[in-house]
Amino acid sequence: MKFTKTEARKRRHFRVRHKVVGTAERPRLNVFKSNTNFYAQIIDDTKGVTLVSASTLKMDLKSKSNIQAAEKVAEELTKKALAANINQVVFDRNGYLYHGKIKAFAQKARENGLKF
């Protein structure tokens, strides 16, 4: 039985979520990409609370779903995270391959000061 791209991503994410857990000391950095926007949030899984979030929904960009948009979201998210005294996170790529937008997002977040 062949899986679609979305089903395969969800299966990968399900497997990874058993291993990746965000705590108060090291919350989980989760990313999601749709056809039109890019979203990222930092989550404390022990409390079930989103600590910081950023997305392209409110940004004024020419294209909200390309690599440059993902880098802008990374800049905004790291700025908010460092202001909230969050330095270390666990990266949850949500089943996506570490390539393209996800890779650009992660590299920009590391450049701006997040450790993962």
From Swiss-Prot:
The keyword RNA-binding applies. GO terms for cellular component: cytosolic large ribosomal subunit. GO terms for molecular function: 5S rRNA binding; structural constituent of ribosome. Signal peptide: none annotated. It holds the Pfam family Ribosomal_L18p. SUPFAM superfamilies: Translational machinery components. InterPro entries: Ribosomal_uL18_bac-type, Ribosomal_uL18_bac/euk. Keywords: Ribonucleoprotein, Ribosomal protein, RNA-binding, rRNA-binding. PANTHER family: 39S RIBOSOMAL PROTEIN L18, MITOCHONDRIAL, LARGE RIBOSOMAL SUBUNIT PROTEIN UL18M. Part of the 50S ribosomal subunit; part of the 5S rRNA/L5/L18/L25 subcomplex. Contacts the 5S and 23S rRNAs. HAMAP family: Ribosomal_uL18_B (MF_01337_B). This is one of the proteins that bind and probably mediate the attachment of the 5S RNA into the large ribosomal subunit, where it forms part of the central protuberance. This is Large ribosomal subunit protein uL18. It comes from Mycoplasma capricolum subsp. capricolum (strain California kid / ATCC 27343 / NCTC 10154). The gene is rplR.
